Amino acid sequence: MNVLSSICYGGDYNPEQWPEEIWYEDAKLMQKAGVNLVSLGIFSWSKIEPSDGVFDFEWLDKVIDILYDHGVYINLGTATATTPAWFVKKYPDSLPIDESGVIFSFGSRQHYCPNHPQLITHIKRLVRAIAERYKNHPALKMWHVNNEYACHVSKCFCENCAVAFRKWLKERYKTIDELNERWGTNFWGQRYNHWDEINPPRKAPTFINPSQELDYYRFMNDSILKLFLTEKEILRGVTPDIPVSTNFMGSFKPLNYFQWAQHVDIVTWDSYPDPREGLPIQHAMMNDLMRSLRKGQPFILMEQVTSHVNWRDINVPKPPGVMRLWSYATIARGADGIMFFQWRQSRAGAEKFHGAMVPHFLNENNRIYREVTQLGQELKKLDCLVGSRIKAEVAIIFDWENWWAVELSSKPHNKLRYIPIVEAYYRELYKRNIAVDFVRPSDDLTKYKVVIAPMLYMVKEGEDENLRQFVANGGTLIVSFFSGIVDENDRVHLGGYPGPLRDILGIFVEEFVPYPETKVNKIYSNDGEYDCTTWADIIRLEGAEPLATFKGDWYAGLPAVTRNCYGKGEGIYVGTYPDSNYLGRLLEQVFAKHHINPILEVAENVEVQQRETDEWKYLIIINHNDYEVTLSLPEDKIYQNMIDGKCFRGGELRIQGVDVAVLREHDEAGKV
């Protein structure tokens, strides 16, 4: 479902914070800025339903009509992001409880237990009232369910959750004996005889059973997803043709977004990279991940900031031009919408110093609003991009349940974190402008030539066979250290590490050697010496050949990186955390073998992506440098700059510092 036929542009709008005369001023400013969509009513439950069962829509009717009269459509919030004070007073047991028994209070946001029965009842009534009220309004283009689910309270440990957890476990395991087997409860005498003996993994004297913890991640994810589906069912019934979504948060650990994405009509997400970090590589990685959740379907960036946030220790603004630059970088990786939090900067409340499209003081020379207007007017020229896709020959495996499991306590290296390992491999693709998708281990891999599996600690039943077939059919599988270790219940695969991946990789890992943070070792390969940190595997070859060996410590000379021929393909194992230079060279060698090339050869810190329709190819080029760069385009092509409309023959192209180009590619005859 496309929300609009053009690039969506706008932001969260909270008119309940402002007097009515400001609403008219806002609508005019939106029109001038090129805004065509706003998210409305997200935190308005207490305004829409000021007391139990009493609804007031008059103010919202007026706001929607004003916006529609000025050409602005609505992504209408279901207002369930924060329960009202009257609800909390009436149902104090709806407040969430942490693992130590501390009850969270009203006065912030997201202060509810997802398994409270009255919460669900009241949500159903509210959502149906909103849907019935606005189902026929021509301004309604999309539903915004709740807001940033689990952002502040991702787990509740109350009695409602305990009861629901036991029910969830019964449905999953059927018998208490099966649960005991899966959880390994004979260890430390944790065996259960009855379901009602099981509680959430609350604060305990020492390590919680990791299998129980892992299942509680799954349970809370499912509980919160059930809340979303409760709202979606009502909205789909009342407005079957209006897209339904909720805003994700990129690499947000508590929620399995691959699972969630199957239930939204379009992926939307919120992104707040820190300007102090320079090149926004993790922002790019998350854009690729969000695009991949629904197999390449374009997504909407639902929130970003024009300038600065308010919740870091030091909240620096984006320098001039960077907001525009990063917006185009998001479009380059598959976005069909660029939205902000929020439209008008709040006067009061916890986010009053969070940047906005309209700052506290606005005049015609204000940099923020000027950049907002420039971007909005430019995006009107890019309707041609809506619905276009990105084609990738490389995939990185990203698995939320694996993430949960690998970061549970009592591991060989308890400071090891999943995202930095994934990002280490992604960074080398980003620097080389190689398009990449993210996939699950069970996904169809036939379209890819190379699949990278960073720290695939958990391998579930059937996933190894999927990877085995990929390699046997000619693919290259690159697997990092600490992979193939456990099953879906965090039970070790017996028979030697890396468990079910041993035959693909042709190795046996005898021991782990986790490194202190300050330790640096070296690895040798046929093209030089490289640093390695964090981890070393003691590897015995079972058919594989060494590509690099360790230089130091008692395992000097043993393999660090290996390659194994399997079927028509190969399995490469990286048994340490090598530096960027080595990873880059390794990947370049693999890509050369598969004839995978950069989209364009460009200078450092120049980002290039290609979006395609059945008819056209579009190059989006982002110069993150603060100086001009020159790049070469194929001379047998003709290009049209979609921002200024000019056509030119390929050859030398200059792009100013902190600037972009969006080019449509033609051949000599003017066609693709």
From Swiss-Prot:
Keyword Metal-binding on entry: yes
Transferase listed as a keyword: no
Pfam families per UniProt: Glyco_hydro_42, Glyco_hydro_42C, Glyco_hydro_42M
Active site per UniProt: 148, 303
Domain of life: Bacteria
Catalytic activity: Hydrolysis of terminal non-reducing beta-D-galactose residues in beta-D-galactosides
EC number(s) from the headed UniProt entry: 3.2.1.23
GO molecular function, one term: metal ion binding
Record keywords: Glycosidase, Hydrolase, Metal-binding, Zinc
GO annotation terms (biological process): galactose metabolic process
Gene Ontology CC: beta-galactosidase complex
Gene3D superfamilies registered for this protein in UniProt: 3.40.50.880, Glycosidases (3.20.20.80), Golgi alpha-mannosidase II (2.60.40.1180)
Coiled coil: none
List of residues binding substrate: 109, 147, 311, 351-354
Chain positions recorded as Zn(2+) binding sites: 113, 156, 158, 161
Family per record: Belongs to the glycosyl hydrolase 42 family.
Protein name per UniProt: Beta-galactosidase BgaB
